[in-house]
Regions:
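NAD(P)+-binding Rossmann beta1-loop-alpha1 motif at the extreme N-terminus of oxidoreductases
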Residues: 1-56
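Rossmann-fold dinucleotide-binding core
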Residues: 117-187, 191-195
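NAD(P)-dependent Rossmann-like dehydrogenase/reductase catalytic/cofactor-binding core
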Residues: 2-7, 29, 166, 176-187, ...
Length: 294
């Protein structure tokens, strides 16, 4: 990328639910996409889920067979960070830990070309802090996709203190090029969505914990009564109960809002290994590991 145009995209953490969804968005929109994760087995499993998603899209007449084939051809995988060296944009969707994300960006700075933009898919952490010490703070931007990324159009775009206007404008234009709908938000915990959703989801968990209603009835009330496509407990299962705890741990110390504190039921379920879709059991049970939607 010498003219501000993004042509090749890397996704770090591409074997995860969010990362694989982001890779679908990129490849489907016509961009060469390099998927990085730490193990080949995880990448192979993600590839199978991705191809299954494309197959469903064809079956539902949302994609032609030719478009499916082209999208699959645009996807490649690597377990080496230097496989992302010539990408114009690298989107990280790794574990929601400041230390992990900072270390990744430092390593990417060592291997990627000078023009590469780094985008963080963090949902809670400060973009300014993530970028700190990476060596190209002016070329780091927040780019928060919503789960499932391949179906949800919204992206929350957040500049850090050092993010250049050119970086933000280029990243903003790219989100539109892949068919997403960006909104700009300040670099604050939770940005827009999670600042509202984390307490709301916790309230739903507490309602189940207090015996107000079953998880299914809480979700049904929200979907039918408020017109939501997904109930809060279905959403927590999709995001991961462990991730919901991480969100709480990021929010509560900053806001001191009691609604942002992790409910005891949530902690007990995570301790029992009930993490939602990823483990096969959360507020609901699941009988397979398939890509959401199609």
């Amino acid at each position: 990328m010498t003219d501000g145009t993004i042509r090749k995209v890397g996704v770090a953490g591409a074997a995860g639910t969010m990362g694989s969804g982001i890779a679908i968005v990129c490849a489907r929109a016509g961009f060469e996409t390099v998927c990085y994760d730490v193990t080949a087995d995880a990448l192979d499993a993600a590839k199978a889920r991705t191809q299954g998603f494309f197959d469903k899209s064809v079956a539902r007449n949302k994609m032609t067979k030719e478009a499916r084939g082209a999208a699959v051809q645009r996807l490649s995988s690597t377990t080496q960070l230097d496989g992302l060296a010539d990408c114009d944009l690298v989107i990280e969707a790794v574990f929601e830990s400041l230390d992990v994300k900072q270390a990744l960006l430092r390593h990417l700075n060592d291997v990627c070309k000078d023009a590469t933009i780094f985008a963080s898919n963090t949902s809670t952490l400060s973009i300014t802090e993530i970028a700190g010490g990476c060596g190209r703070e002016d070329r780091v931007v927040g780019m928060h996709f919503c789960l499932p990324a391949q179906l949800m159009k919204l992206i929350e775009m957040s500049p850090g203190v050092s993010t250049s206007d050119a970086t933000f404008d280029t990243a903003w234009a790219w989100t539109k090029a892949v068919g997403q709908l960006p909104v700009q938000t300040q670099d604050k915990p939770g940005f827009i969505l999670n600042a509202l959703l984390v307490p709301f989801n916790n309230d739903a968990i507490r309602a189940v914990e207090a015996g107000v209603a079953s998880a299914a009835d809480v979700d049904k009330a929200i979907k039918v009564g408020l017109g939501y496509k997904m109930g809060p407990l279905e959403l927590v299962d999709l995001v991961g109960l462990d991730t919901q705890i991480l969100l709480c741990e990021a929010f509560y110390p900053v806001t001191l809002d009691p609604r942002a504190a992790a409910p005891p039921l949530l902690k007990r379920m995570v301790a029992a290994g009930h993490l939602g879709r990823k483990s096969g059991r959360g507020f609901y049970t699941y009988d397979g590991s398939t890509m959401f939607g199609g």
